Structures are given as C-alpha cells and as structure tokens.
Amino acid sequence: MLILTRRVGETLMIGDEVTVTVLGVKGNQVRIGVNAPKDVSVHREEIYMRIQSEKDNENGPQSY
C-alpha cells in the first residue's frame, strides 16, 4: 500500500485521468473529492462490497 500525506486542498493523481482531492478534515473524518471519467466506477468500500455480494447472489450457487 502506498501511503501519501496531503493537506486540505492538495490533490493526488491516479493514472492520467483520476484525481483525488482532500476537501476537509474534521476530527477523525476526511472529506475527499474524486474526479474520474464516467466509465470509471467510484464507490465507498462498503457499497462496492454490497454490489459484489448482490452480483454473486444473482449468479446463484455454481455446480460443478
């Protein structure tokens, strides 16, 4: 895992098209903004895991 330090208002780049900007810090919460192309999905981890779980349920158990 790459660990970076950023201050409010500073941005980091992921590839050529995705930016992540620190918008604010209050207590133990950090607000970030993500700029990404429309074809790149951006989700909080818990939402992503729910989506993956729902996909697995739609496919049903696999028999071999």
Swiss-Prot record:
It comes from the Bacteria. Keywords: Activator, Cytoplasm, Repressor, RNA-binding, Translation regulation. GO terms for cellular component: cytosol. GO terms for molecular function: mRNA 5'-UTR binding. InterPro entries: CsrA, CsrA_sf. It is found in: Cytoplasm. SUPFAM superfamilies: CsrA-like (SSF117130). Gene3D superfamilies: Translational regulator CsrA. It holds the Pfam family CsrA. The keyword RNA-binding applies. One of its GO terms (biological process) is negative regulation of translational initiation. The keyword Cytoplasm applies. Signal peptide: none annotated. A key translational regulator that binds mRNA to regulate translation initiation and/or mRNA stability. Mediates global changes in gene expression, shifting from rapid growth to stress survival by linking envelope stress, the stringent response and the catabolite repression systems. Usually binds in the 5'-UTR; binding at or near the Shine-Dalgarno sequence prevents ribosome-binding, repressing translation, binding elsewhere in the 5'-UTR can activate translation and/or stabilize the mRNA. Its function is antagonized by small RNA(s). Belongs to the CsrA/RsmA family. Homodimer; the beta-strands of each monomer intercalate to form a hydrophobic core, while the alpha-helices form wings that extend away from the core. This is Translational regulator CsrA. It comes from Tolumonas auensis (strain DSM 9187 / NBRC 110442 / TA 4). The lineage of its organism: Bacteria, Pseudomonadati, Pseudomonadota, Gammaproteobacteria, Aeromonadales.
